[in-house]
């Protein structure tokens, strides 16, 4: 099995990998340039090493393909969606799928009769509203950068902030992308930590920035 970050609108469930699936994953590389190409390399390597073994692609975005248009469309020029696929996709789908099914089983409820809010909290963080076992909205968007504050990702901010900083500091789009994905989040607030255990320990010792990071993250999750 291969965890594939982006299945776009092509894949709404896990699939057996064949040549058409490989082409489909490759066609979505522009939506996940850091993840889909390496995923493909892994698939092709296993196909070469073990050609007789069936391979399955499990897509991080698939669970969220049940979101309604009102949840996944953005109020931006329609051409951006039609030509480039710009919309909310959501991520951590495999995690949210498992959690909702497991929670229903623990509560001894039919999954169709449940309403859950599922939280995936690690270095990446996402929140998903699930109705009847299906995703109806989620915090991550076009990329995993959107939503809650994360270890190194900023989460939701005013879209004008990157444009403002490009104007002020002369950053390239690649530099801004790196800053928002790799140098932001609780790392930026604390100045040194991404591990919440370290943050909790130092916060208990009175460090105001670790305390602030905890409070900001909790506030954003509740919001």
Predicted regions span which residues?
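Gly-rich Lys/Arg/Thr-decorated short loops/hinges at beta-loop-alpha junctions or inter-strand turns
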Residues: 22-27, 77-84, 201-209
């Amino acid at each position: 099995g291969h965890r594939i970050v982006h299945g776009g609108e092509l894949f709404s469930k896990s699939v057996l990998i064949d040549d058409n699936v490989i082409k489909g994953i490759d066609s979505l590389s522009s939506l996940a340039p850091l993840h889909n190409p390496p995923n493909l390399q892994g698939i092709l390597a296993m196909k070469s090493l073990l050609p007789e073994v069936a391979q399955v692609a499990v897509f991080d975005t698939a669970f969220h393909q049940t979101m309604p248009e009102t949840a996944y469309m953005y109020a931006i020029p329609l051409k951006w969606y039609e030509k480039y696929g710009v919309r909310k996709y959501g991520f951590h789908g495999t995690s949210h799928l498992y959690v909702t099914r497991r929670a229903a089983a623990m509560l001894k409820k039919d999954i169709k009769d449940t309403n859950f809010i599922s939280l995936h909290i690690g270095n990446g963080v996402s929140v998903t509203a699930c109705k009847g076992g299906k995703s109806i909205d989620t915090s991550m968007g076009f990329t995993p950068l959107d939503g809650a504050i994360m270890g190194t990702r900023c989460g939701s901010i005013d879209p004008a902030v990157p444009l403002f900083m490009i104007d002020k500091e002369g950053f390239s789009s690649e530099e801004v992308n790196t800053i928002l994905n790799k140098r932001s989040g609780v790392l930026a607030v604390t100045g040194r930590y991404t591990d919440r255990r370290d943050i909790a320990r130092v916060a208990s010792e009175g460090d105001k920035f670790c305390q602030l990071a905890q409070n900001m993250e909790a506030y954003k999750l509740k919001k």
